[in-house]
């Protein structure tokens, strides 16, 4: 399932996966240093040994008298020959040392430095990008919380207004109108929580905190050229240090968010261009008079006097008063509604801003993961080359060391970059690419212009289609596109290649907030990008088409019945029958499309396997990822079975459902009163609870009116038309699970108990038994 860095080091927070990869790559940097030190020592040893050999050939001649030298003596000739060979061996070792320095050590050192710098640069870029994403993520949570609080305040006020009589309401309105703007502001905000960073304070609590800050941190005058000197200032790092020492602010991100909110609340002012808070000694901030007044303290100096000499500063300081005058005639109801609209606008902008940042982070990480895999591959290949160079150097100069040179060649052949990459993935991978989308969640459950990351059932209900429009439109577009492609190989490859994430995100952005998904928009992009955005849509769903709660059950089926194909397919058929109607219809659409493509192309078996590897996580994925799952092949096998036997499974489901539907009609007509069973979704309390909770119509409502003659023929069958009686037990289970929030383990055990039995009657009895136990608890 995980075959490369680009699909192996992802995590929900992005930082965990990236950190794990760099920890592994740092081992390679350390290995480079060890090899470099070994080569240096080996070079020095050869150099010292060669010099020593030459030295001893000279030492042996000391004390020997020239007249005692007999050129004709054989012993003297042997002595001179031995001395010459030893001296020559010394020269060879010195030449080896020089070649090691110039041909191996110097290039290897350069490669090692370049490799280390590449990793450091990549790590710094990714760290900064992820930190920026985290800041925007925390900003989104803060703006969402503020928006929800404003909505609740408005609801509370409206409820209180309904309960009070008109006379009391008029008296309260008159009282608030007579009171001064400052008193009115204090009364209105007295019960509101003030949010600073990731903390919330009541006004009296914030008063104590501000008083302590202003009394403990050193305040000084700060001179700005031309504008003059400003009192009551300090640098950003002083404020951050105080916050981390005195408040539960564990991280710099949280501290900077706290400081940013001090600016937003009007307690602090940045001495310079812009209004951002930065933890730095170079950024200075002035505590406004509002902070001293709120804390019940007197500022050392007032900026009012400076304002007389500096009209620009006076205008800046009067913004707050102008704002209060602008809305002084508002009633409390108008003010609350305005604040809700303002908070909603800020929250929705934060969602869009975070989504853009997230896609940029994912594109950057994907590019860097590919780059880092290439860096590691090049490093290992360099090892392979330098082993061969070392063997050549030794064998050329010292034939007697041929055995050592041959052994080095053996070591060189052992090095396989692909194996090293695979080892890193198998031992340290954190998970495949499974993006986490933060969608705009309106307080009143209204999602209008979002497609990606939205639950498939909600999206289908909004589109008034049984299959989301984005899925059906893309599949229809591909059907029209296939005949125009050059060959079967091209038609297969567009499903197997991974398009650049930046291109996929560009099409995603064009579709996500558009009023409709059109083929005209799709035609502006390559086929592989269109298929890439379809895969991305499935990956960004809150849960996979085959829910994560069934992941362990599917694993159990393939572990226990991998060789018994008929029984395994029957269990899968039972599993699919319990999916939600929209999930069934969507799964049917994609599998039917792919099965038709497989049928019309050659090399069906190979294409099916490759396609299953590419799409397995789009159809079924676990709730959480771990190392044990990454070696699990059952998602791919499950996808292979769907691609191979899907049409047969769906046809069998249609036949079983048709016969059961006829029997249900006979029983209904022969009985004066409808049957009452625990699994029937026709119970009034079940239907009402589902409608009130999901705001989606009951699955039965679209099918109960069908007459037998209206049941689609085999050639027309898709799971969009599966009658609801087949999935009644699954829908009842899904409703109860949603409302009562069952644990994962209990849901898995109950599902396993259902699929062990082969008879549909036993399945219904098992569900009914479980329902009775749940109602008792």
From Swiss-Prot:
Q: Which organism is it from?
A: Schizosaccharomyces pombe (strain 972 / ATCC 24843) (Fission yeast)
Q: What is this protein called?
A: Rho-GTPase-activating protein 8
- Ranges for domain Rho-GAP come to 454-650
A GO CC annotation given for this chain:
growing cell tip
Subunit structure, per the record? Interacts with pak1/shk1.
Which locations, inside or outside the cell, does it occupy? Answer: Cytoplasm
What sequence ranges are listed for the domain DEP? 213-296
Q: Does the keyword Translocase apply?
A: no
List, as start-end ranges, the regions of compositional bias called Polar residues: 668-692
Q: Which CDD domains match?
A: DEP_fRgd2 (cd04436), RhoGAP_fRGD2 (cd04399)
């Amino acid at each position: 399932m995980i075959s490369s860095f680009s699909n192996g080091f992802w995590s929900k927070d992005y930082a965990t996966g990236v950190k794990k990869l760099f920890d592994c790559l740092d081992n390679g940097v350390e290995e480079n240093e060890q090899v470099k030190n070994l080569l240096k020592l080996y070079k020095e040893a050869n150099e010292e040994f060669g010099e020593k050999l030459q030295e001893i050939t000279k030492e042996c001649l000391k004390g020997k008298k020239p007249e005692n030298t007999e050129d004709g003596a054989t012993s003297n000739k042997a002595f001179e020959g031995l001395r010459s060979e030893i001296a020559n061996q010394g020269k060879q070792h010195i030449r080896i040392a020089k070649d090691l320095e110039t041909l191996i050590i110097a290039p290897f050192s350069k490669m090692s430095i370049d490799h280390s710098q590449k990793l450091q640069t990549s790590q710094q870029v990714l760290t900064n990008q992820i930190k920026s994403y985290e800041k925007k993520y925390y900003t989104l949570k803060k703006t969402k919380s503020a928006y929800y609080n404003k909505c609740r305040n408005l609801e509370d006020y409206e409820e209180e207004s309904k309960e009070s009589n008109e006379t009391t309401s008029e008296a309260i309105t008159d009282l608030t109108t007579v009171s001064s703007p400052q008193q009115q502001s204090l009364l209105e905000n007295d019960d509101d929580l003030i949010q600073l960073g990731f903390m919330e304070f009541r006004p009296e609590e914030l008063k104590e905190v501000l008083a302590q800050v202003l009394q403990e941190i050193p305040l000084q005058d700060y001179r700005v050229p031309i504008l003059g000197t400003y009192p009551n200032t300090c640098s950003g790092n002083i404020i951050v240090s105080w916050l981390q020492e005195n408040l539960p602010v564990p991280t710099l991100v949280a501290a900077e968010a706290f400081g940013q909110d001090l600016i937003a609340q009007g307690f602090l002012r940045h001495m310079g261009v812009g209004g951002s808070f930065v933890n730095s000694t170079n950024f200075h901030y002035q505590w406004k008079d509002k902070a001293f007044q709120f804390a019940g303290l007197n500022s050392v100096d007032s900026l009012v006097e400076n304002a007389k000499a500096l009209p620009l500063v006076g205008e800046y300081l009067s913004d707050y008063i102008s704002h209060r005058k602008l809305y002084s005639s508002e009633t409390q109801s108008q003010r609350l509604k305005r604040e809700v609209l303002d908070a909603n606008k800020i929250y929705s902008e934060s969602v869009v801003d975070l989504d853009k940042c997230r896609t940029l982070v994912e594109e950057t990480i994907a590019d860097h993961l590919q780059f880092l895999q290439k860096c590691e591959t090049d490093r290992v290949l360099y090892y392979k080359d330098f082993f061969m160079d070392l063997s050549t150097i030794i064998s050329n100069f010292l034939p007697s060391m041929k055995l050592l040179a041959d052994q080095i060649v053996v070591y060189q052949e052992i090095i396989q970059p692909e194996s090293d990459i695979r080892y890193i993935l198998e031992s340290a991978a954190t998970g495949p690419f499974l993006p986490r989308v933060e969608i705009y969640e309106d307080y009143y459950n209204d999602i209008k212009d979002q497609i990606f990351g939205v639950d498939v059932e909600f999206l289908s209900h909004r589109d008034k289609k049984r299959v989301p429009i984005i899925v059906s439109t893309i599949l229809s577009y591909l059907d029209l596109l296939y005949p125009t492609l050059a060959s079967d190989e091209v038609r297969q490859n567009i499903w197997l290649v991974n398009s650049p994430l930046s291109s996929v995100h560009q099409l995603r952005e064009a579709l996500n907030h558009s009023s409709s998904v059109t083929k005209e928009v799709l035609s502006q992009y390559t086929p592989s990008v269109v298929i890439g955005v379809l895969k991305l849509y499935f990956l960004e769903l809150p849960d996979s088409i085959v829910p994560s709660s069934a992941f362990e059950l599917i694993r159990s089926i393939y572990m226990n019945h991998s060789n018994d194909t008929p029984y395994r397919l029957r269990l899968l058929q039972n599993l699919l029958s319990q999916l939600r109607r929209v999930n069934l219809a969507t799964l049917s659409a994609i599998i039917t499309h792919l099965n038709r493509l497989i049928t019309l192309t050659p090399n069906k078996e190979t294409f099916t396997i490759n396609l299953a590897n590419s799409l397995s996580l789009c159809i079924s994925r676990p709730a959480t990822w771990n190392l044990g799952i990454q070696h699990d092949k059952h998602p791919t096998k499950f996808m292979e079975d769907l691609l191979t036997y899907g049409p047969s499974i769906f046809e069998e489901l249609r036949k079983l459902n048709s016969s059961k539907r006829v029997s249900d009609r006979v029983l209904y007509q022969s009985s004066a009163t409808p049957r009452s069973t625990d699994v029937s979704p026709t119970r009034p309390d079940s239907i009402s609870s589902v409608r009130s909770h999901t705001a989606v119509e009951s699955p039965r409502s679209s099918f109960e009116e069908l007459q037998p003659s209206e049941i689609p023929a085999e050639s027309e069958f898709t799971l969009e038309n599966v009658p609801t009686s087949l999935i009644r037990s699954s829908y009842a289970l899904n409703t109860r699970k949603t409302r009562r929030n069952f644990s994962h383990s209990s849901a898995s055990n109950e599902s396993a108990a259902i699929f062990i039995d082969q008879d549909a009657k036993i399945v219904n009895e098992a569900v009914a038994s479980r329902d009775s136990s749940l109602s008792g608890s």
